[in-house]
UniProtKB/Swiss-Prot annotation:
It comes from the Bacteria. Belongs to the bacterial ribosomal protein bL33 family. One of its GO terms (molecular function) is structural constituent of ribosome. This is Large ribosomal subunit protein bL33. InterPro entries: Ribosomal_bL33 (IPR001705), Ribosomal_bL33_CS (IPR018264), Ribosomal_bL33_sf (IPR038584), Ribosomal_zn-bd (IPR011332). One of its GO terms (cellular component) is cytosolic large ribosomal subunit. GO terms for biological process: translation. It comes from Shewanella baltica (strain OS155 / ATCC BAA-1091). Gene3D superfamilies: Ribosomal protein L33. The keyword ATP-binding does not apply. The keyword Glycosyltransferase does not apply.
Length: 57
């Protein structure tokens, strides 16, 4: 019997500082349907900036 596919989807968090840096993570589309915004560290400019969700190509 095959295992059911989960609700989690892989996403990319892209820096709003336009440095090109990004993090990859997963999120549950059922519990959190809106786009994610989170403040994380950008090592290129060595500051905490807001990262916004983008699709992984």
């Amino acid at each position: 019997m095959a295992k059911a596919k989960g609700n989690r989807e892989k996403i990319k968090l892209v820096s709003t500082a336009k440095t090109g840096h990004f993090y990859t993570t997963e999120k549950n589309k059922r519990n959190m349907p809106e786009k994610m915004e989170i403040k994380k560290f950008d090592p290129v400019i060595r500051q905490h900036v807001i990262y916004k969700e983008a699709k992984i190509k």
